[in-house]
Regions:
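Short active-site neighborhood of thiol/selenol oxidoreductases, capturing the structured segment around
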Residues: 97-118, 136, 140
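N-terminal hydrophobic targeting segments that direct proteins to the cell envelope
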Residues: 61-87
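Structural alpha/beta surface segment adjacent to cysteine/selenocysteine redox centers
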Residues: 115-196
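Mid-domain, small-residue-enriched loop/turn segments at the edges of structured enzyme/sensor domains
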Residues: 198-200
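N-terminal carbohydrate-binding/catalytic regions of secreted carbohydrate-active enzymes
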Residues: 43-46, 61-63, 112-115, 119-123
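C-terminal cap of thioredoxin/glutaredoxin-like
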Residues: 2-69, 203-271
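Extracellular/periplasmic catalytic domains that process cell-envelope and extracellular macromolecules
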Residues: 98, 130-131, 170, 244-246
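A short beta-strand-turn-helix
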Residues: 84-101, 242
Length: 271
Protein backbone atom coordinates (compact mmCIF):
# COMPACT_ATOMS: atom_id res chain seq x y z
CA UNK A 1 0.00 0.00 0.00
CA UNK A 2 2.82 2.45 0.68
CA UNK A 3 4.24 1.75 -2.73
CA UNK A 4 0.86 2.31 -4.27
CA UNK A 5 0.55 5.69 -2.52
CA UNK A 6 4.03 6.78 -3.65
CA UNK A 7 3.12 5.96 -7.27
CA UNK A 8 -0.04 8.10 -7.12
CA UNK A 9 1.86 11.03 -5.66
CA UNK A 10 4.40 10.76 -8.47
CA UNK A 11 1.62 11.12 -11.10
CA UNK A 12 0.05 14.12 -9.39
CA UNK A 13 3.41 15.93 -9.25
CA UNK A 14 3.80 15.78 -13.01
CA UNK A 15 7.10 15.67 -14.83
CA UNK A 16 8.86 17.80 -12.26
CA UNK A 17 7.87 15.45 -9.51
CA UNK A 18 8.99 12.44 -11.47
CA UNK A 19 12.27 14.10 -12.32
CA UNK A 20 12.92 14.91 -8.67
CA UNK A 21 12.19 11.39 -7.53
CA UNK A 22 14.15 9.98 -10.42
CA UNK A 23 17.08 12.19 -9.57
CA UNK A 24 17.24 10.97 -6.05
CA UNK A 25 17.11 7.35 -7.18
CA UNK A 26 19.84 7.93 -9.77
CA UNK A 27 22.19 9.45 -7.21
CA UNK A 28 21.62 6.53 -4.89
CA UNK A 29 22.18 4.14 -7.75
CA UNK A 30 25.33 5.97 -8.76
CA UNK A 31 26.73 5.72 -5.27
CA UNK A 32 26.17 1.97 -5.24
CA UNK A 33 27.61 1.40 -8.70
CA UNK A 34 30.61 3.75 -8.68
CA UNK A 35 33.63 1.64 -9.74
CA UNK A 36 35.85 3.25 -7.13
CA UNK A 37 33.31 2.73 -4.40
CA UNK A 38 32.85 -0.90 -5.45
CA UNK A 39 36.59 -1.50 -5.17
CA UNK A 40 36.62 0.05 -1.70
CA UNK A 41 33.69 -2.07 -0.60
CA UNK A 42 35.30 -5.18 -2.04
CA UNK A 43 38.53 -4.46 -0.18
CA UNK A 44 36.70 -3.76 3.07
CA UNK A 45 34.51 -6.80 2.54
CA UNK A 46 37.55 -8.96 1.81
CA UNK A 47 39.31 -7.75 4.94
CA UNK A 48 36.19 -8.41 6.98
CA UNK A 49 35.95 -11.96 5.64
CA UNK A 50 39.61 -12.62 6.43
CA UNK A 51 39.16 -11.26 9.95
CA UNK A 52 36.05 -13.37 10.48
CA UNK A 53 37.84 -16.49 9.23
CA UNK A 54 40.80 -15.75 11.50
CA UNK A 55 38.50 -15.32 14.48
CA UNK A 56 36.70 -18.58 13.72
CA UNK A 57 39.96 -20.50 13.28
CA UNK A 58 41.37 -19.00 16.48
CA UNK A 59 38.18 -19.93 18.31
CA UNK A 60 38.32 -23.52 17.05
CA UNK A 61 42.00 -23.88 17.99
CA UNK A 62 41.41 -22.31 21.40
CA UNK A 63 38.41 -24.54 22.04
CA UNK A 64 40.42 -27.63 21.11
CA UNK A 65 43.20 -26.56 23.45
CA UNK A 66 40.75 -25.91 26.27
CA UNK A 67 38.92 -29.21 25.85
CA UNK A 68 41.81 -31.46 24.82
CA UNK A 69 42.41 -34.65 26.78
CA UNK A 70 45.36 -34.00 29.07
CA UNK A 71 48.12 -36.64 29.26
CA UNK A 72 46.26 -38.52 26.54
CA UNK A 73 47.51 -42.07 26.21
CA UNK A 74 48.69 -42.39 29.81
CA UNK A 75 45.81 -44.65 30.71
CA UNK A 76 44.92 -46.02 34.12
CA UNK A 77 46.64 -45.47 37.42
CA UNK A 78 48.78 -48.44 38.43
CA UNK A 79 50.33 -47.25 41.69
CA UNK A 80 47.63 -45.37 43.60
CA UNK A 81 45.73 -46.86 46.52
CA UNK A 82 42.51 -45.76 48.20
CA UNK A 83 41.36 -45.53 51.80
CA UNK A 84 37.92 -44.62 53.09
CA UNK A 85 37.48 -42.47 56.18
CA UNK A 86 34.67 -42.90 58.69
CA UNK A 87 32.79 -40.00 57.10
CA UNK A 88 32.90 -41.51 53.61
CA UNK A 89 35.70 -39.47 52.05
CA UNK A 90 37.93 -41.64 49.86
CA UNK A 91 41.57 -40.59 49.73
CA UNK A 92 43.65 -41.74 46.78
CA UNK A 93 47.42 -41.37 46.75
CA UNK A 94 50.67 -43.18 46.02
CA UNK A 95 52.06 -44.94 49.09
CA UNK A 96 55.20 -43.30 50.45
CA UNK A 97 54.87 -40.22 48.27
CA UNK A 98 55.15 -36.56 49.24
CA UNK A 99 52.49 -34.91 47.06
CA UNK A 100 52.88 -31.37 45.83
CA UNK A 101 49.13 -30.83 45.96
CA UNK A 102 46.06 -32.28 47.65
CA UNK A 103 42.69 -31.64 46.05
CA UNK A 104 39.12 -32.40 47.07
CA UNK A 105 36.86 -33.48 44.22
CA UNK A 106 33.07 -33.38 44.49
CA UNK A 107 31.25 -35.48 41.89
CA UNK A 108 27.94 -37.18 41.20
CA UNK A 109 28.08 -40.43 39.23
CA UNK A 110 25.18 -39.29 37.02
CA UNK A 111 26.66 -35.86 36.29
CA UNK A 112 27.55 -35.34 32.58
CA UNK A 113 29.97 -32.53 33.43
CA UNK A 114 31.76 -34.89 35.81
CA UNK A 115 32.14 -37.33 32.94
CA UNK A 116 33.65 -34.50 30.91
CA UNK A 117 36.07 -33.77 33.76
CA UNK A 118 37.07 -37.42 33.72
CA UNK A 119 37.48 -37.42 29.94
CA UNK A 120 39.62 -34.32 29.91
CA UNK A 121 41.66 -34.73 33.09
CA UNK A 122 41.26 -38.32 34.27
CA UNK A 123 44.45 -39.59 32.69
CA UNK A 124 46.43 -36.60 33.91
CA UNK A 125 45.14 -37.19 37.44
CA UNK A 126 46.20 -40.84 37.14
CA UNK A 127 49.63 -39.76 35.93
CA UNK A 128 50.16 -37.30 38.76
CA UNK A 129 48.94 -39.84 41.31
CA UNK A 130 51.41 -42.41 40.01
CA UNK A 131 54.19 -39.82 39.97
CA UNK A 132 53.52 -39.11 43.63
CA UNK A 133 52.68 -35.47 42.94
CA UNK A 134 49.01 -35.58 43.86
CA UNK A 135 46.57 -36.76 46.50
CA UNK A 136 42.84 -36.72 45.74
CA UNK A 137 40.05 -36.75 48.29
CA UNK A 138 36.85 -37.90 46.57
CA UNK A 139 33.49 -36.73 47.89
CA UNK A 140 30.76 -38.55 45.96
CA UNK A 141 27.39 -36.81 46.20
CA UNK A 142 23.93 -37.94 45.11
CA UNK A 143 21.76 -34.90 44.41
CA UNK A 144 21.04 -36.30 40.93
CA UNK A 145 19.24 -39.34 42.33
CA UNK A 146 16.04 -37.57 41.29
CA UNK A 147 17.21 -37.64 37.68
CA UNK A 148 18.03 -41.35 37.63
CA UNK A 149 15.64 -44.04 36.44
CA UNK A 150 15.90 -46.01 39.68
CA UNK A 151 15.70 -42.94 41.87
CA UNK A 152 18.86 -43.83 43.79
CA UNK A 153 21.54 -44.47 41.18
CA UNK A 154 23.93 -41.79 42.42
CA UNK A 155 23.79 -43.20 45.95
CA UNK A 156 24.32 -46.76 44.74
CA UNK A 157 27.26 -45.79 42.54
CA UNK A 158 28.80 -43.86 45.44
CA UNK A 159 28.23 -46.91 47.62
CA UNK A 160 30.00 -49.08 45.05
CA UNK A 161 33.06 -46.85 45.16
CA UNK A 162 32.96 -46.93 48.94
CA UNK A 163 32.87 -50.74 48.88
CA UNK A 164 35.94 -50.85 46.66
CA UNK A 165 37.82 -48.34 48.79
CA UNK A 166 37.08 -50.37 51.92
CA UNK A 167 37.63 -53.87 50.55
CA UNK A 168 40.01 -53.42 47.60
CA UNK A 169 41.52 -50.01 48.16
CA UNK A 170 44.92 -51.46 48.97
CA UNK A 171 45.10 -52.98 45.50
CA UNK A 172 46.93 -50.43 43.33
CA UNK A 173 44.77 -48.79 40.69
CA UNK A 174 41.52 -50.61 41.45
CA UNK A 175 39.58 -47.69 42.90
CA UNK A 176 40.61 -45.34 40.11
CA UNK A 177 39.75 -47.98 37.51
CA UNK A 178 36.18 -48.25 38.82
CA UNK A 179 35.94 -44.48 39.15
CA UNK A 180 36.90 -44.08 35.49
CA UNK A 181 34.53 -46.85 34.41
CA UNK A 182 31.54 -45.20 36.07
CA UNK A 183 32.05 -42.06 33.99
CA UNK A 184 32.81 -43.83 30.71
CA UNK A 185 30.27 -43.02 27.96
CA UNK A 186 29.33 -46.67 27.57
CA UNK A 187 28.50 -47.00 31.27
CA UNK A 188 27.21 -43.70 32.61
CA UNK A 189 23.41 -43.55 32.47
CA UNK A 190 21.71 -40.52 31.00
CA UNK A 191 19.97 -37.99 33.19
CA UNK A 192 16.23 -38.65 33.11
CA UNK A 193 16.97 -41.76 31.06
CA UNK A 194 14.88 -44.90 30.76
CA UNK A 195 17.41 -47.07 32.57
CA UNK A 196 20.50 -47.06 34.75
CA UNK A 197 22.87 -49.66 36.19
CA UNK A 198 21.68 -52.29 38.64
CA UNK A 199 23.74 -53.21 41.69
CA UNK A 200 24.88 -56.34 39.88
CA UNK A 201 26.01 -54.34 36.89
CA UNK A 202 27.96 -52.05 39.22
CA UNK A 203 29.52 -55.13 40.79
CA UNK A 204 30.46 -56.41 37.34
CA UNK A 205 32.23 -53.12 36.60
CA UNK A 206 34.10 -53.47 39.88
CA UNK A 207 35.11 -57.01 38.95
CA UNK A 208 36.51 -55.77 35.64
CA UNK A 209 38.41 -53.09 37.57
CA UNK A 210 40.03 -55.81 39.68
CA UNK A 211 37.96 -55.59 42.85
CA UNK A 212 37.88 -58.49 45.28
CA UNK A 213 34.95 -60.88 45.66
CA UNK A 214 34.19 -59.23 48.99
CA UNK A 215 33.95 -55.82 47.34
CA UNK A 216 31.74 -57.22 44.60
CA UNK A 217 29.36 -58.74 47.15
CA UNK A 218 29.27 -55.45 49.04
CA UNK A 219 28.19 -53.74 45.82
CA UNK A 220 25.70 -56.31 44.57
CA UNK A 221 23.88 -56.31 47.92
CA UNK A 222 23.87 -52.52 48.18
CA UNK A 223 25.56 -52.75 51.56
CA UNK A 224 27.00 -49.24 51.44
CA UNK A 225 24.20 -47.41 49.66
CA UNK A 226 22.75 -45.83 52.80
CA UNK A 227 26.18 -44.97 54.18
CA UNK A 228 27.04 -43.28 50.90
CA UNK A 229 23.77 -41.33 50.94
CA UNK A 230 24.41 -40.14 54.49
CA UNK A 231 27.93 -39.07 53.58
CA UNK A 232 26.67 -37.34 50.43
CA UNK A 233 24.29 -35.16 52.43
CA UNK A 234 27.18 -33.96 54.58
CA UNK A 235 29.37 -33.40 51.53
CA UNK A 236 26.74 -31.20 49.89
CA UNK A 237 26.35 -29.14 53.04
CA UNK A 238 30.10 -28.67 53.28
CA UNK A 239 30.37 -27.81 49.60
CA UNK A 240 27.62 -25.24 49.94
CA UNK A 241 29.56 -23.59 52.73
CA UNK A 242 32.78 -23.54 50.72
CA UNK A 243 31.13 -22.17 47.58
CA UNK A 244 28.84 -19.67 49.26
CA UNK A 245 25.71 -21.66 48.53
CA UNK A 246 26.62 -22.49 44.93
CA UNK A 247 27.20 -26.20 45.38
CA UNK A 248 27.41 -28.13 42.13
CA UNK A 249 29.40 -30.83 40.42
CA UNK A 250 32.09 -31.23 39.43
CA UNK A 251 33.88 -29.00 41.90
CA UNK A 252 37.58 -29.21 42.68
CA UNK A 253 38.78 -27.59 45.90
CA UNK A 254 42.40 -26.63 46.59
CA UNK A 255 43.51 -24.86 49.74
CA UNK A 256 39.90 -24.35 50.72
CA UNK A 257 38.79 -22.62 47.52
CA UNK A 258 37.21 -23.78 44.23
CA UNK A 259 39.59 -24.26 41.32
CA UNK A 260 38.85 -22.76 37.91
CA UNK A 261 38.96 -25.81 35.66
CA UNK A 262 40.83 -24.42 32.68
CA UNK A 263 43.09 -26.63 30.60
CA UNK A 264 46.20 -26.23 32.78
CA UNK A 265 44.74 -26.10 36.28
CA UNK A 266 46.35 -29.36 37.39
CA UNK A 267 49.68 -28.60 35.74
CA UNK A 268 49.83 -25.37 37.72
CA UNK A 269 49.01 -27.12 40.99
CA UNK A 270 51.70 -29.78 40.76
CA UNK A 271 54.29 -27.46 39.18
Amino acid sequence: MAQSGASKNGKNQGKGGKSSAGGRQSVAAARRSSPGNNRTQLIIGGIAIVVIIAIVVFGVVLNRQQTATQAEGYGASTQSVATASADGVVTVTKPGSTPKATIDVYEDALCPACAELERQFGQQINQQLDNGNLTVNYHMVDFLNRSSHSGDYSSRAAGALLCVAQDSGAQPGVYMALHSALFAPENQPAENGSTDLSNQQLADLAKTAGASDQAQTCISTGANTQAAATAAATFMTNLGTITGGRAGTPTVIYNGAPVTLNSDWLTKLVG
